[in-house]
Amino acid sequence: MRVYAGIDVGGTKVALGLFGEDKTLLGKAKFPADPSLTGEAFFRRIVEVLQSKMEELGLPWEQLQGVGVGLPCMIRYPQGQVVLCAMLPALNGFPVKECLEKLLPGVQVEVDNDGHCAALAESRHGAGRGRQHMLFCPVSTGLSSGIILDGKLFRGSNGFAGESGHTLVTPGAGIPCGCGNQGCIQS
């Protein structure tokens, strides 16, 4: 059996799910995100939890075929490198995909912004199924969005379309945001 992992990294927690080829949920785990860790230590911890969960479920490590990671960060896609991560600043500039490919040799790895991941999932398997255009706006520790146009994820000219949490609503005023600006809707 082939096994796939979906990993949702948030500002305060990490959630992962293991799925079979038929998209059946085999198991899941959730643990606190530790913002004090370096990028490498942060993702090494995720891989340790993933390995532990697979062992607990009796799934041989060799069955892991792919890992998808959504992060609350601006991601340079398809390279899978963090550009800016207001929620987890230790990840700024970190090459997530490269790190995971080293930790998970032979496993396909995809890394993207969590709003983009959620919009794609909702458009393919949720309330947006069959729709050509959709806006998905998840609200959690932060605020994000993902845009589906003509049935495809819209990334914009710089790849960061949908970063609605960092839209300036009161430029230079209000609570400072983790991105370095003041006046972001997220703050």
Regions found by a protein language model. Give the residues of each.
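Glycine-rich phosphate-binding loop and adjoining helix at the ATP-binding site
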Residues: 35, 39-47, 62-67, 73-135
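Glycine/GP-enriched mid-protein hinge/lid loop-to-helix segment characteristic of carbohydrate kinases
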Residues: 17-19, 27-29, 38-41, 103-104, ...
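Short glycine-rich anion-binding loops that position phosphate/pyrophosphate groups of nucleotides
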Residues: 12, 72-75, 140-142
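Acidic active-site catalytic centers that drive phospho-/nucleotidyl reactions
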Residues: 8-10, 20, 76, 114, ...
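Short catalytic/binding micro-motifs of nucleotide second-messenger systems
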Residues: 53-57
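A short alpha-helix-loop-beta-strand transition element characteristic
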Residues: 60-62, 156
